[in-house]
Amino acid sequence: MAVLEKFIELVKIDSPSDPASPTCPSTAMQLDVANHLERVMKEMGVSNVRQKDGYVYGEIPATPGYEDKTAVGFIAHMDTAPEFNGIGVKPQIIENYDGGDVLLAGSGHILSPKDFPVLLGYKGHTLVTTDGTTLLGSDDKAGIAEILEAAEILLQGEIPHGKICLGFPPDE
């Protein structure tokens, strides 16, 4: 599964945080992401995958001959910001962006290069946006997707490396 597919799968799992909550994770919905990550990591072949209180951990053992190298850790949080609706995310994928206006179909809002000239730098690339009715949740589900993609590549064993530790906490 490509990184984009991993990302889309993750943003469709509701996981807003609640700053008023006395618990951690602050919302039970974050456990849905934790359970998903635990399952995916085990299916990928990540070692020592475990979950406690919504925190998900795993390891990629060092390749032979690199066991004495310093371990590296990658961490990305699974909650999304509570300041805007994060329930029922409907991502839009715009392949080969043409440099024009981007309609957020659910809200009717438009992202225009006139207002956001940085968009022009993405001409010809794939854009992922929200439909405008929710946030997208790329902070930090994009980070999770990238870490999972890197883990999948490293597990193929063609790139030598020391031990790699993965951590996915709830509540930034």
Describe the residue ranges of each PLM region.
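A non-catalytic alpha/beta surface segment that caps or lines the substrate-entry region
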Residues: 22-69, 73-75, 79
